[in-house]
Amino acid sequence: MKQDTHPDYHFITVVMTDGTTYKTRSTLGKEGDTLNLDIDPKTHPAWTGGGHQLLDRGGRVSRFNAKFGAFTRK
């Protein structure tokens, strides 16, 4: 079997939108890095019934709404 074919799998810290943190294993970054979530199961409209607004990071939501906003149900 080939050596060094798998990426490094190590522990990182995940920070949810409400500040809750937990450790998990990942191939992201390096040992001890932190992943800050913009959206998580506690704030995602699909899991909360759509009551929360999405944060517009980088204008993606605005661009999407500008392009497809006319197709929404009223």
From Swiss-Prot:
Domain of life: Bacteria
Coiled-coil intervals: none
Alphabetically ordered keywords of this record: Ribonucleoprotein, Ribosomal protein, RNA-binding, rRNA-binding
GO MF term (any one): rRNA binding
Gene Ontology CC annotations of this record: ribonucleoprotein complex; ribosome
Presence of the UniProt keyword Heme in the record: no
Pfam families xref list: Ribosomal_L31 (PF01197)
SUPFAM superfamilies for the chain: L28p-like (SSF143800)
GO BP: any one term: translation
Quaternary organization: Part of the 50S ribosomal subunit.
Family: Belongs to the bacterial ribosomal protein bL31 family. Type A subfamily.
Function text: Binds the 23S rRNA.
Name of protein: Large ribosomal subunit protein bL31
Species of origin: Phenylobacterium zucineum (strain HLK1)
